[in-house]
Amino acid sequence: MSNKVKSDIEIASKAEILPVTTIAKHLGLDADALELYGKYKAKLSYDTIHSLKDQEPGKLVLVTAINPTPAGEGKSTVTVGLGDALSKKDKKTVIALREPSLGPTMGIKGGATGGGYAQVIPMEDINLHFTGDFHAITAANNALSAFIDNHMQQGNELGIDGRRIVWKRVVDLNDRALRKVVVGLGGPVQGVPREDGFDITVASEIMAIICLASDLKDLKKRLSEIVIGYNYKKEPITVGEMGYEGALTLLLKDALKPNLVQTLEHTPAIVHGGPFANIAHGCNSVSATSTALRLGDYVVTEAGFGADLGAEKFLDIKVPALGKAPDCVVIVATIRALKMHGGALKTELSEENVEALAKGFTNLQKHTESIQTFGIPYVVAINKFITDSDAEVAKLEALCEEHGIPFSLTEVWEKGGDGGLELADKVIAAVESGEADYNRIYDDAWSMEEKLEAIVTKVYGGIGVELSSKAQKQIVEFKKYGWDRYPICMAKTQYSLSDDPTLLGRPTDFVIHIREFIPKLGAGFVVALTGDVMTMPGLPKKPAALNMDVDENGNAQGLF
């Protein structure tokens, strides 16, 4: 390998990419099972998905992580590299990932196709517009907003109270200027003036619905159950009452179909859906994971950010919908993130600091304990970076051994599947041990307060919950409507176990502050907004987009 570090886009652009029909053959599917989007991308048809439903599912491996740095810790990279490594171990493997959002792609974190020699391709297409799923979701979401405003303009038969509309418009970009807007200005013929706002598309309830719906019938039912706001009697109003679930389903009928692509090493990858884990449930679609489980012996999937967010939601929200719990969990840890949790400055994470690493190790410990609470065996993947010193690697390995934490030093970014062979061996051993005994940490019949308490104490390590006066009133209201039976989806900072992004490591004796609840009945959960978390991110001072370009031949530059 050359000493020069190649960029992700350089590696991906020079890769040998097979026709997606060839990838489908590896899974036992012929060309008729696909709806082609060019030569290298395809959607799986409804007939194909339905034909697989009665097949026995394979083994499921969930990849999660410790609390990350702003740049991310390579969870997607490890997911892809582990999938390739399992393929090299002669396991029929399928990778199931979320689709990237243009917000972080253009912002600071970059895309979500992995990195180095562990990527899904065509990465340029996937990181930009892919098969148009996010655009369809954006269109459906904003169509509903248009229907709401038109209903109010055309007589307002349902008595929608414009002050109590909870449905927001969306765009798949980080755009802080759109968080609060006023619509309907310009006089009587321009609409009814009201306050509105934009979320990022991945925070839309329709995104969550796409990712949790089992089929078109279920999609339509879930869309009809969306609460758009309240009438003047303070009663909830749903899409079903407005009568637009059919039109929304029509807009989304193709977006519900999972997308098939491949890794650099030609392992099949089903990439579909993309809710964030800090402001939504953070998992790819049930349809994609379920289909992958029936096509492969091993399925490697991921859940966003740390185990306190994506993994908790995967295990408490997605697993009941999927009907299958993971057989093993992989927790991705990096030396740079552990140093940050140990007090090292963000500007100094590339410098050797064994002391900070040892201090930050407690963050990893907490996440291993949380996964054990769910009754699932785990392996820690130490995702090696080129800036990691030998002394730091040795210290982290020694700490894992000292505390009985199973681990593997993973170098898939540099070596592809070959860099994850030991991790694959340990994952196979964990899966075949049969030790998985899934325990959900709360029951849907529990009160909202009890569910919140379970998440905060068992997963975050906090001591309790503090509800704002608004949240307290909402709990009374939600009980009245029977909404308290839904799972809780916490909207919380990804950087800390607490709701304070500056409280790193393993904080104790903290409470989680709930400022507001948002009913997402179509998705089938209630969102609890904590701290200052935003559902529309902003751009950094120097967005990644500054380094992006396209040459005269149409080749992308600067994507990662």
From Swiss-Prot:
Reaction catalyzed: (6S)-5,6,7,8-tetrahydrofolate + formate + ATP = (6R)-10-formyltetrahydrofolate + ADP + phosphate
Classification via InterPro entries: Formate_THF_ligase, Formate_THF_ligase_CS, P-loop_NTPase
Gene Ontology MF term list: ATP binding; formate-tetrahydrofolate ligase activity
Domain of life assignment: Bacteria
Pathway(s) where this gene product acts: One-carbon metabolism; tetrahydrofolate interconversion
PROSITE patterns: FTHFS_1, FTHFS_2
Pfam families given in the database record: FTHFS (PF01268)
Matching CDD domains: FTHFS (cd00477)
Keywords: ATP-binding, Ligase, Nucleotide-binding, One-carbon metabolism
Binding-site list for ATP: 69-76
GO biological process: tetrahydrofolate interconversion
EC numbers: 6.3.4.3
NCBIfam families associated with the record: PRK13505.1 (NF010030)
Entry's family note: Belongs to the formate--tetrahydrofolate ligase family.
Protein name as catalogued: Formate--tetrahydrofolate ligase
Gene name linked to the record: fhs
